[in-house]
């Protein structure tokens, strides 16, 4: 939430597991993004997993910031972060660090807790500037 109490959100095209002990994730964001200034160390965020049924939410959070939360139901999670119950799951995390690289930044977050709301239908993947679902499993990693 902003200091004025407005919710903040954006679509991260890549969220990556960074470590398991402690549990860490990372994401990248353009420094010119309207959400960037709010991703300071100590800030709480909700990272939602998306599937084919929630593609609309990825598109909504990538739209103009004035429209991101219009006509969308969400609950107030820890530290008042927006949590969307329509998604398969959510990870609550705290920003550990922010490293600026050229006009972008790498955000490292500590995973605090997670919640599952339902089973994902078809996981959503962002690839070559478009949304896709996963295809056939090619090989197990033994």
What are the roles of these predicted feature ranges?
Residues 1-142:
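Basic, polyanion-binding surface patches
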């Amino acid at each position: 939430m902003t200091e004025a109490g407005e919710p903040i959100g954006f679509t991260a095209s890549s969220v990556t597991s960074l470590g398991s002990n402690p549990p860490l994730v990372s994401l990248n964001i353009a420094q010119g993004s309207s959400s960037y200034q709010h991703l300071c160390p100590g800030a709480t965020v909700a990272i939602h997993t998306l599937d084919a049924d929630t593609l609309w939410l990825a598109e909504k959070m990538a739209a103009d910031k004035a429209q991101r939360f219009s006509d969308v139901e969400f609950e107030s999670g820890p530290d008042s972060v927006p949590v969307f119950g329509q998604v398969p799951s959510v990870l609550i995390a705290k920003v550990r660090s922010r490293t600026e690289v050229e006009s972008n930044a790498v955000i490292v977050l500590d995973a605090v807790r997670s919640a599952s709301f339902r089973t994902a239908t078809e996981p959503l993947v962002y690839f070559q500037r478009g949304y896709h679902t996963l295809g056939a499993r090619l090989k197990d990693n033994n």
